[in-house]
Structure formats: C-alpha cells, structure tokens
Amino acid sequence: MIELTAASSNLPSYLAAYDTNFSYNGNGWFSRSFSTGQDQWSAGVDTEGVDNNIPSVIMGIDDYSYSPGLFNGDVTSLTLGRNLEYDAGQDLWVQDEELIINNVSGYMPDTTTFAYAIYSLSHGGAVDGLGTFPGLTDYFAEQGTMQVGNLGLDDTLLGFGGQDTFVFQDGSAFDTVNSFDLAVDILDVSAWGATGLGDLSISTIGADTVISSSDFTDGITITGVTGLTAANFEFA
C-alpha cells in the first residue's frame, strides 16, 4: 500500500523531485534500537539538528542484513521523506514522513527487483532505476499497488504498469489518476457509498473520463482513458 501525505499529494511530481534532490550516494546503514529492538536501514544526509530539506529513506525491518543487490530479512515498511536525523530518546532514525509504503497483509515481498530498487534509491534517489538496475517504480509495476490519497487535497495518483488499485475516501475531493490501465486497474469508490455505476456520474471530456460521486462533492479525472466499465470499480 502506498499512503500519500500532503507532501506527496501530486505523486508524479513528488517522485521526480525526490530523484532530483536526493544528494546522498552510498549503501546506507543499519541500526537497531536498544530500547525497542527495531531494526532499520536508512539512507540520506543527517541534519545534525538543523533541517536540511534533503530527501531520505528509512526501511523498517525484522532480522535484516544487506549487501548491494542482496539482502535477507523481512521488510515491514519503506518510507520516503526528508530531514533525516537520529533521535537519541527513541534510539531510532527519524524523518519527516512523506510517502509511506507497506504491505497491509504482512511483510513486503523482497524480490530481486526490490533489492536493486533499494540500491538505486540510496545511490542518488533513482526511483526509476540506476543504469541497468531496476528502481522503485519497477517494483511497483512488478507487485501492483494500492494507493490511498489524502482528504480534501486534490491528489494526483499514478499507475505503474501493474495492477493498481486507487482508493478514494469520502471527502477525498477532486483527484486525478494518470497512466490508468483500463485492462487491470481498479477505482475503489466504496467509501463514497456507491454500490454500482448508477450511483456515479460518469462523463467523457476529450480524451479523459470524469467520475463524480452522487452528491458531486468528490470526483476523479482519469487522464487519457475512456471506456471504463463496472469491472474497473470496487463498490460498497
């Protein structure tokens, strides 16, 4: 599951800026909290107490070890953010969390693609991969995603080429989905109370599809795609 925050509300722009502004280049480091036993892998530039606004990444792990392109252990979460620093009180590395990635049914699959995506991330924030190495977006395509946006922030979500499910909350406002795959992607509008297509207003504007809730307080624009059917929705 990919959870957006206000900082990552426009997901395509966020990922592009993360790649551009990530200045750390190395293998990252492991740490274990003596107070909680929590294992972490972190990569980024330590603020040393003064915010630097530089992107960073923290992985929550159980019994984890890593060498470039190879690791063992169980990944509980991967969080992109900025302003990385060590919190002595918690004996943990922390950051301003901006994009939270986890698996709602357990650990994140630690495939070969994931291992190389982590390498690409820590070497310059290359979310789309580094040279011949896959990136985080390749992992999203491999595994599929469930993307959960914000309340009231007019998010822009992004399909990655696998089976993506876009979850819209009651009060999600007017969101946009780019790179929607008509063959496999799903729009979850169950929180709107919609039980079928009859509970939605669906129109075509140029090459886009515009979907509105029954009370027109929430909406979705699917860019560059028309011809959606009930198979593209998850209803209440």
Regions flagged by a language model, labelled:
Residues 35-46, 73-76, 144-148, 161-166, ...:
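Short, hydrophobic/aromatic-rich segments at coil-to-beta transitions
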